[in-house]
Amino acid sequence: MGLLFTPKHQKLVNQCYPTGRTPDKKPKSSETSYLLYYVNSRRTKLEKVSAYLVKRTAADLAHRRIGNVMVTLELAEKIVTSCKENLNVFVKEFLDIMIKTLSNNNFNLDVCVVEAAEAVFSSICQHLDGVLCNSDLEFTQMYRSFVDVYCQVVTERLHNDELLMKGCLDISKTANLAGNPGVSSLISRGVELTLAKFQEVQPRFQGESLQVDLHSSEKRLSRSQTHLTAAEESRVLGGYPEQALQSYFSTTETDKLSIAIRALIKRLLEVPNKELLQYIANTIPVQLRYILVLVFTHALNQEDEHAVVLLKLMTTLLVSDVSIIGLSVLDLLRKIINFQLASATSPQVTEACTNTISALNRKTYYKDQPIDMISELLLKLKEHPGQREKDILISDLQAVLQTVGQPFMTLELFLELAPYVPDRLELFSLVTDKLPGGFVMNKFFLFLVALESPGEQEKLLDDAFAKYKNFTLLSGLIYFLEEGNTPSNLYYCYHTKAARFLEFDDYHSQAQYKRQEREIFTRNDLVNYYSDPGCNRYAEKGLRILISQNTRVSTTDLTETPPEGELQIPDIPLPPTPPTPQQHRMFLNSDASVKSLDKMKSPKVSDLKRAARGIRVAPSHSSLRASQSVKSRVTNITFLLNELNNESQETGIYDPEEEEVVGLEKTDLARSISAKVSPAIAYSSKRFGNLTSSLDLELQEDAFQDASGEIEASSAFRGKLFSS
């Protein structure tokens, strides 16, 4: 009767177990398939099946049924794989089953049982998501408890390194494990165990190896590669330790990678081995390898006795063939310098920091990297005036310069570095042939004057002629004409080398003679050598310098030749020419007439007729006040009246009544003004003279003055003054 009322999920689970007490049982295949279909149909079925498996496992453990426990673990592994979307429903029950199984001393000595538990754990780790790991505290505790029990069993009871590496590999497959502080330490633990076993099976990674050779390799690009990659080497080595290391370090999870690198540093401090470090670095994705260098930098501590080891390991990594991209060179340089200055009392630490800075510049991560590093060191030199700090920074500066094998700096940067570098000739060999500015060349000659060694002066001047050629020639000519026109070794050295550069034997002989007599070249002496363009291709530029009052000639003037025949005339501002009295008088009259337009009243035709008949116009009639800008008003009015009478007689134009006449507008008056400036052609002055005597206008404000000349208008204006 008991079997009649057994729940269906229990029946399906029980049917998967074979009969008998043999330890090597396997679940029945057909019944297992139906059970998987059953648990996939509804979510509630999973809860019932997982709870029943926990209950049955407890009974099997109590009765030492190893075969049934093996069947239970295999069923659990199949359910995890089949129902991974609902893993959070039953995962804690399955972890409980595995913890109880491995905690039972009657079962944890059986390798098969432990392997079956590891298979279930591996399946769980592969399908876990970050939400479950970070939100469920109970699951986190059970996960950690199982790892502790499992590692204890395989190391203390079974002594099985393969199972240990499998467990470490399973931990590395758990996604987003680093985000949970409760279980993130398991990553560090797994890396340490894996590295220890890996070094045991690989002899070349055993023992200390910290030799740093900073002079064997030349400066090269950061993406060089000369040996097997990590993936290729892993295939050659084989085994679970290599697979586990690949899983821990060949990841794009930066949190997980940082934890793994810190575990690596802890192991390397125990047994420093640069080959192991380079192998692990090649395992990391190339775009994330800069994290390895950053973690090493963060691990530095001036109170830590392992600082020298860390710096040496970092140095070996930077000079190795490991490709690193995305490294912030200046940030790393600043951190190392700050640590170095803070540990200035320790010679070993400061020397190790100098080697690391030198190694940092042995690979080119971007174009202007050496210039930026040197500029940063120069800035630190200005910020730290103490002698001890200066000595340390100068040592760093010289170490960086030794890593550069080709010209890269400007002349201006050379002048800033020269006071801190003893071998200035070697330093000048790193200067490019890019033309500097005239001010920089002037500073260069001032620097040469300050040098105490004549041989050094001569050699640097030779190199300057070799790099800048005619620019050095003309810049030196400017300098010695303006500031250095005194007898000195550099003065005669310049003229001697200028003569050799121009291939003038006479110039060279004069330079030797004046050196002996302690005389200087005058401008006239030098003009002789720059006066013939046929012999001296730089004659025109040199002559401009010699005859110029201002010797400050621009770089463009020294490097470019103006077109032939072009005359360089200086722009001299001319003083303004004062106007003549006649121009001034015309200007005043014109201005007054224009201003008086607004005050004038327009004349009427009746006013003009009255004036023509000799009738005096009363002051109250608002008589005309015409313009005086060019000629007299009398002449103007006479011309208008005569024009009106002639046109009326010839064409018979109707003369409107006085009350219908519209006064002249100001625009009409302005047109009449424009007519006054035209030369008289059609009319003679005699016609005006007869009417002038009859005109007697009283002006209201302006002082009347008759015109000194007569005016005539062209026929082009006839009859058009009143047409509007």
From Swiss-Prot:
The membrane spanning regions, by residue number, are none
Q: Which Pfam families match?
A: EFR3 (PF21072)
Its signal peptide is: none
* Any one biological process term the GO annotation gives: protein localization to plasma membrane
Gene Ontology CC, one term: plasma membrane
Top-level taxonomic group: Eukaryota
Similarity comment: family membership? Belongs to the EFR3 family.
* Database matches in PANTHER family: PROTEIN EFR3
Q: What is this protein called?
A: Protein EFR3
Its gene?
Answer: EFR3
